[in-house]
Amino acid sequence: VGTSSLRRRAQLLHRRSDLRVVEFRGNVDTRLEKLRGGVAAATVLARAGLNRLGRTDVTGVSLAPEDFLPAVAQGIVTIETRESDGEINPLVTALGDPKTQKCADAERALLFVLDGSCRTPIAGYATHETEDLWLRGLVVAPDGSQAFAGERHGAANDAAAMGADLGRELLALGSSILEALR
């Protein structure tokens, strides 16, 4: 399976230790060409990216985010502004989705406590239905040999606290993995 993501590699190997995961870099066309060329038998691509490119010819299996956790805040689009910009900030704030913001708050708090980056196999996924928020988090050894998962459920207004709490739990469980990566 071809992927350049350490998080995806670790999750794949945790689920299927018999897989051989190879480095796959490049845009969608480059990755698909490598696939056709036999560099790998499969690859992991974002469905949103394929849809955006109109690539209806690419078929495969969708990995449910509940089972194959994404990177923290993956898929959330944001606009960054200067804090002091009193003219633009109200306009941008009006564009925001409060439920998505709560999910981002929970996921980012989780990542902050774990001191994660794109070079750490950490995943987080929050969903906000009704007034409640569900948060799942995961720390996986790069070789897939160990994984520590946890989840929280509670009031969406406590999103950041839930994320930090889950982060502390996963830090205690997966500290050996995270220390080895630093």
Functional labels for PLM-detected ranges:
Residues D18, V22-R182:
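Small-molecule-sensing regulatory modules
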Residues V1-D18:
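Bilobed "Venus flytrap"/periplasmic-binding protein-like clamshell domains
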